[in-house]
């Protein structure tokens, strides 16, 4: 096996020797080769998507939770917060320190919940898409459609067949729209309007 591109045609991967018998350069090359192999495998892609989805979901959840407090006078007080008297109807009736404590606690919970959901969906979708692509041995838009349908249907199957069908259609449509947008740069360039 020889690496392709970027002038690496002359570089071969290290021989199959025990790791401790390799030179430092060969150890680095072997480590890089192992990382690339992991990152291009289906479990690796699923793990990377899960971690990335968790991080982005946390940021998104934190942002959305912070937007929930844009009108503090009309924000109802949480009913299950410990130490709150029953007569408190709105968050603005509480002392400032308690308001801040409740808001940060709520933002943390919402952020973590959103992070878990995004990570879970990203991991499942990416893993299913990789498996579908491996089974079909093609890289086209239908992999994303099938993965979206299987992911959406799989996530909603506990709610019944109608919900699974709606989840399948919704995820497949969203995946198709994203894939069409991302593959847009592979199209034929537009006609030159100076020739007309």
UniProtKB/Swiss-Prot annotation:
Residues 1-27 are annotated as: Disordered. GO terms for molecular function: mitochondrion targeting sequence binding; protein transmembrane transporter activity. The keyword Transmembrane helix applies. Disulfide bonds join 42-130, 149-168. Its main location: mitochondrion. The keyword Transmembrane helix applies. GO terms for cellular component: TIM22 mitochondrial import inner membrane insertion complex. GO terms for biological process: protein insertion into mitochondrial inner membrane. It is found in: Mitochondrion inner membrane. It is a multi-pass membrane protein. Keywords: Disulfide bond, Membrane, Mitochondrion, Mitochondrion inner membrane, Protein transport, Translocation, Transmembrane, Transmembrane helix, Transport. The chain crosses the membrane at residues 47-67, 141-157, 162-182. Essential core component of the TIM22 complex, a complex that mediates the import and insertion of multi-pass transmembrane proteins into the mitochondrial inner membrane. In the TIM22 complex, it constitutes the voltage-activated and signal-gated channel. Forms a twin-pore translocase that uses the membrane potential as external driving force in 2 voltage-dependent steps. Belongs to the Tim17/Tim22/Tim23 family. Component of the TIM22 complex, whose core is composed of TIM22 and TIM54, associated with the 70 kDa heterohexamer composed of TIM9 and TIM10 (or TIM8 and TIM13). This is Mitochondrial import inner membrane translocase subunit TIM22. It comes from Kluyveromyces lactis (strain ATCC 8585 / CBS 2359 / DSM 70799 / NBRC 1267 / NRRL Y-1140 / WM37). The lineage of its organism: Eukaryota, Fungi, Dikarya, Ascomycota, Saccharomycotina.
């Amino acid at each position: 096996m020889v690496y392709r591109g970027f002038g690496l045609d002359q570089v071969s991967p290290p021989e199959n020797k025990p790791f401790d018998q390799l030179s430092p350069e060969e150890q680095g090359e072997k480590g890089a080769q192992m990382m690339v192999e992991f990152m291009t495998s289906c479990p690796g892609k699923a793990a990377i998507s899960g971690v990335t989805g968790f991080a982005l979901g946390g940021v998104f959840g934190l942002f959305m939770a912070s937007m929930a407090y844009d009108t503090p006078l009309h924000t109802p007080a949480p009913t299950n917060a410990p130490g709150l008297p029953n007569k408190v109807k709105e968050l603005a009736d509480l002392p400032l320190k308690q308001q801040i404590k409740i808001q940060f606690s709520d933002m943390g919970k919402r952020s973590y919940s959103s992070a878990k959901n995004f990570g879970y969906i990203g991991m499942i979708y990416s893993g299913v898409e990789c498996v579908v692509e491996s089974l079909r041995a093609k890289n086209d838009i239908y992999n994303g459609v099938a993965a979206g349908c299987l992911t959406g249907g799989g996530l909603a199957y506990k709610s019944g067949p109608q919900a699974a069908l709606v989840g399948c259609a919704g995820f497949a449509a969203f995946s198709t729209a994203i894939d069409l947008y991302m593959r847009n740069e592979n199209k034929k360039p537009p006609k030159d309007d100076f020739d007309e």
